[in-house]
Amino acid sequence: MAQIQRFFKMGSASGILLFFFALLAIIFANTSLNNFYFNFLDIPVSVQFGEFMINKTLLHWINDGFMAVFFVLVGLEVKREMLEGSLSRYQLAIFPAVAAIGGMIVPALIYYLITNQHPELSNGWAIPMATDIAFALGIVALLGTRVPLPLKVFLLALAIIDDLGAIVVIAVFFSEELSIQALSVAIVAIAGLITLNRMKVGHLCAYLIFGLILWAAVLKSGVHATLAGVIIGFCIPQKDSEGKSPLHTFEHILTPWCSFFVLPLFAFANAGVSLGTINTDMIFSTLPLGIALGLIVGKPLGVFSFSYFSVKLGIAKLPEGIKWKQVFAIAILCGIGFTMSMFLAGLAFTDGQSDSLINTLSRLGILLGSSVSAILGYLLLKSTTK
């Protein structure tokens, strides 16, 4: 029991769990458990209250429901960093902000250049933009105190801004035909959350009630349901009427659940690639190549070049205690898209089948790109932090 407790207290524990459950999914998808795995994810699950009903496959419940909880945590983290952390002052925020912008633009551009002759793949441009913060921080944690604190803060701030970019992309590009009735309910729920915030209500149950209404309304509206999670996170007050911090309390509650349950579950549900159907031609086909090169080449090129030129042009300042070689190592680690890239792939290629060819190819590209980025980033970071 003591060994289990020590494991969960490790900074790298969440990254190790993500890797384990992704590997488990690949094993399931390539053994006699193959049919069980994919059929299990395609089981329809319905929830009904009167005339209101949500009918989704188990895979969609994980991606739309459980991941909404993760995005509540993202909203809480972004708000905390904006109010009191690494994004609270212009001087602190500008360096990782510029780096994050480069890390979104260049991978998308590389993906476009590789896939532009295939219009059916055009929706996938956002896939290599993402960074899996849990996995990236897990790898950094493997090196312990050798990694300077300012470098860890840089990675965290960059990843948070990267998440904000992903939220904007989801809202603008991956929303379906809108339902005015559902959006009206969502607006009322948001008004309720804002009222609770302005009144500095500290009881999280009140936010949970309005949050569930908001999530269901957004799900039915055509806007992706995970955006409800971000809004809920932003509406949790930093201080309540008694001077306590609901924001910190809720973040403290959600962090272990997201790190050790939600994200590993998502990895297990989305990382299953059936390797038996894959050959060399498929590995080097347009979709996986565009995603993999976007992550392996585009991410470090974008993050490093934008941050480097921002310093040279006097826009930003290199944080003290950080070397450019270390910035480049972090830039490579940002190519670990993994769960976030899989999430965006699920939005980009929505055919409703967990084992379709296009989903298999996109997952293959994500796994290849993320694995190479993780290995190269770890080796370079280790060599620059002796």
UniProtKB/Swiss-Prot annotation:
One cellular component GO annotation, for this chain's record? plasma membrane
Q: Which domain of life is it from?
A: Bacteria
GO-annotated molecular function = sodium:proton antiporter activity
Which reaction(s) does the protein catalyse, per the Swiss-Prot or TrEMBL entry?
Answer: Na(+)(in) + 2 H(+)(out) = Na(+)(out) + 2 H(+)(in)
List where the protein spans the membrane: 10-30, 58-78, 94-114, 124-144, 154-174, 176-196, 199-219, 253-273, 283-303, 327-347, 361-381
Give the GO terms filed under biological process for this record: regulation of pH
Record's keyword annotation contains Cytoplasm: no
Topology relative to the lipid bilayer, per the entry, is: Multi-pass membrane protein
Cite the entry's keywords alphabetically.
Antiport, Cell inner membrane, Cell membrane, Ion transport, Membrane, Sodium, Sodium transport, Transmembrane, Transmembrane helix, Transport
Localization, UniProt: Cell inner membrane
Pfam families listed in its UniProt record:
Na_H_antiport_1
Q: Which residues form a coiled coil?
A: none
General function of this protein: Na(+)/H(+) antiporter that extrudes sodium in exchange for external protons.
What protein family does this chain belong to? Belongs to the NhaA Na(+)/H(+) (TC 2.A.33) antiporter family.
What is the protein named? Na(+)/H(+) antiporter NhaA
- What gene is this protein a product of? nhaA
